[in-house]
Every structure is written in structure tokens, then in C-alpha cells.
Amino acid sequence: VMLLFELLNLGLKRFPIYRISFTTGILGIVVTALFLGYGYYNIKHVVATTYDLKSDKVEDLKILEIADLHMSTSLSVTELQKYCDEMSQLNADLVVLTGDIFDENTPLDDMVNASKALASINNQQGIYYVYGNHDNGSHAFSDSEFGPEDVRATLEKNGIVVLEDAVVSLDNINIIGRKDASFWGTNPRLSTSQLLEMIPENKRSEEHTS
């Protein structure tokens, strides 16, 4: 090995242009490796972020948001169940699943079992789901064992509410779920004003009714 290294070093000294090319190539490999390593770390390293928002229109409300799991690509069902058990300890008022929970690489069994795991999270007012571009959009299920309607049926079977241009009014809050912008098809998503009009009159704020 040392002999090969010395021969390589001698060649680079005799031909400077190759030394520049070699150095540039090594630098590119190192940068790429660091970039991929950083991405892999972020995929596998789940971080909880807390936001404390103030409003005089609602009493204390704990909302748990989960997004971009890309099941089986970045997270196994076993890992997800462990996190769901931990999140249950938060005793959230409601849980929102905001897209790309699944993608085209998620096996059917993992989609089904992940839906069960997510449904097991302890909450007071329900679990709500909106599609992302990998759930029901431009990248959705191109080579998958299942489609968006299978996702909907499985989630709803487990008691998770799918919101696609729909409104749910709870005692102290209105939840609006929009259709993903990347998948309009022949049925464009509703505007914000149209969705607001779907809120029952007795659940609207004074600003909206005026």
C-alpha cells in the first residue's frame, strides 16, 4: 500500500496538472460525502421543536404536528411506534399530520402498520391528516403498491380524519385542511376565502363575520 502511495505521489509531482485534477476530485468526493452524511443524520435524528403562540381567541391548546416521515425511507414502523409511545406522554389536545407521511417507496404493510401506530397517539380532540406532494401529489406513488385512496381508507379505518379542502369545527378551534398545491388535476383546490366560508356561522370569529 505504501509503495502504491509513493508511486502515486511521485506521479503527481512530475505532472502538476494531474495533481490539480486529483485534488479537485478528492475535494468533490469529501464534500459529497459530508453532504450525504449530514442528510442521513437529519433523516435519522428526530428533533422535537416547541412553539409557544399566544392568542386571546383560544384557551390553552396543545397541538402536536408530525410531518415528512417518508415511512420506510427514513423511519421504520418499529421506530415510529417508539416515537408514538413517547408522544402519547405529551397528552396533546389534537394531532395534525401535515403531509409526506408516506411516499412511493413505502411498502403497503408499512403504510398500514404506520397508520395504526399514528392512531395510537394519545389525544383529546382527534388526529387530522392532510396530503403532501409525496402522499397525493406530483411524486405520489409512481411505483407504489398502493394509491392515495388506499391511504385515505386506511387512515379513516384507524380513526384519523383526512382533510382535503375540508373544515372541522371543534369546541374552541376550526381546522382547515387544504388540497396539496402540487396535485390539482382537473379539480383545482379551493381558495382560502372559499374554505373560510365553509366554517359554520356560530364558529366564526367577529372579524370573519363582519
Residues covered by each model-derived region:
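Hydrophobic alpha-helical transmembrane segments in integral membrane proteins
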Residues: 32-56, 73-78
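Soluble catalytic domains of enzymes that build or remodel membrane lipids, polysaccharides, and related
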Residues: 57-210
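Non-catalytic terminal accessory segments
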Residues: 1-43
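Short, charge-rich amphipathic segments
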Residues: 9-24, 48-55, 79-92
